[in-house]
Amino acid sequence: MSRRCAYGYLFETPIPPDAQVMRKYTHAPHPLVLRVEGPATGPDRPLGGLRVHVGLVGRAVAYFPNVLFALSALGKMGIGSARLPYALRSAVDLSTGLESPLGGRSAVVRPPESVRVPIALGSPGETPVRVRLETPVRLVADGKLVRQLDLARLVSASLRRLELLWRIHGDDAEQDWSLDSAALVALANCVDVLDDRTRWVESDRFSRRQGQEHPMGGLVGEVSFGSGAAIFIPVLRLAGRVHIGKHTAFGHGHFVVVAEEDQRSVPATASSSNSPGVDG
């Protein structure tokens, strides 16, 4: 399908003919991440409600109206085995905080702001870093599922995810990837795991199109890393926003980074203009 087709680009995501990566593959990482939170309750929401986080990367930002329309149409069809309907109440641009009410023929949603986030390293420090896996993180290393997470595997998956998104969906094709991923993974391999409170959760997804179930289990919980982990905080925080591992389009692979103090982000190269970035 053409990259100008919303469905083809967001859900099929073919490899561009001029791509310098993933030449042996037929499909690239999707530039779309959906994550559902809830139900949320409150005075204005007595029956509870769901909050759907939509993440669009690079050129995919232009297709936000298509995604919003699809979510609205899905609500009319109903979700789950019981086909429960829902209605969209509002859309919030997290980069600006602007909320646009929905529902009704006169509803107007402004296109979201595209924010360029540089892919950078942080300042070295001794501060312990705690990572909270909020949705199942399903990683594969050496052909096997990762059931114990160390910093090297987390950094490796994060860098690979960011680099592929940047190369396939970014607008900085004239710039080269400036991070030495192999060296950074080797550095992360020297960092100790201080506390591992992760656990494996099993889940499956039934594909009506393929007529079979697909395993979607992964790690959730918290893991803490020791001295030397602080330099990776900006990379990990950005990777957490775009999710890592398998089934990211279904909301899996979301994690957040918690540190005892904020880390100052510095460019990975001498000039910040040379640092790769992800638009979203």
Task: Show the residue positions of the predicted features.
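RNA-interacting cores
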Residues: M1-G280
